[in-house]
Amino acid sequence: GSSFGPARRGRQTYTRYQTLELEKEFHFNRYLTRRRRIEIAHSLCLTERQIKIWFQNRRMKWKKENKLLSSSQLSAEEEEKTAE
């Protein structure tokens, strides 16, 4: 590609910086408060929705990597889905 911009082929591409920042946040917190999500969205020039989806995807990836999940963590995830 010639122009470097967000490739809108149905899938969001994140810059290396954005990915690193999101990974760093995820390392400390797998779940974001709405306030924190807004802060991150502003600092990374992303939408809240993008942050939310990135974290959802990241948690799914994390789950696959950590098959041995305690039931307490699973119930916390269910609570978040219904709190939408």
From Swiss-Prot:
Predominant cellular place of this UniProt entry's protein: nucleus
SUPFAM superfamilies reported for this sequence: Homeodomain-like (SSF46689)
GO cellular component entries: nucleus
SMART domains on file: HOX (SM00389)
Portion annotated as DNA-binding: 7-66
UniProt-listed Gene3D superfamilies: Homeodomain-like
Signal peptide: none
Domain of life, source organism: Eukaryota
GO terms for MF: DNA binding; DNA-binding transcription factor activity, RNA polymerase II-specific
UniProt keyword list: Developmental protein, DNA-binding, Homeobox, Nucleus, Transcription, Transcription regulation
Locations listed in the record: Nucleus
PROSITE patterns xrefs: HOMEOBOX_1, HOMEOBOX_2
Job of this protein: Sequence-specific transcription factor which is part of a developmental regulatory system that provides cells with specific positional identities on the anterior-posterior axis.
Family named by the database record: Belongs to the Antp homeobox family.
Identification of the protein by name: Homeobox protein Hox-B6
Naturally occurring in which organism (per UniProt): Gallus gallus (Chicken)
Gene: HOXB6
